[in-house]
């Protein structure tokens, strides 16, 4: 299996925990094609959390890393609540800081209470709602 196929499988499996208003309609081959395009496109950056045989999670953002806009953060359901999401976010935060960014932002499904709680526990705050179903959450960086 390719990275794109593994990412597609993980996102499809984990998406059931998002409480989406509209479920994904993509098939695994369609998602794999989408991820093949993203992984080869210089406009996206993806950080993988993986072991010798498993992909545990991933985080993707636009190439303008300093903007801090996370497009996707998914953890394999078998490995949720083990700190992998927090580690991926800490890595992304460091990448944004290195590039001179001052915040990190993510859109969360309004019904995804687990994710809202997760981001809130990491000092993200709700800043707006868009498209009736996404909460924009942001964490501002403050220099000590």
Name each model feature, range by range.
Residues 12-34:
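Conserved GNAT-fold acetyl-CoA-binding loop/helix
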Residues 89, 96-107:
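Conserved GNAT acetyl-CoA-binding A-motif
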Residues 48, 54-62, 69, 74:
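Conserved beta-strand in the GNAT
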Residues 102-144:
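C-terminal "cap" of GNAT-fold acetyltransferases
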Residues 36-42:
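Short loop/turn motifs at secondary-structure junctions and domain boundaries
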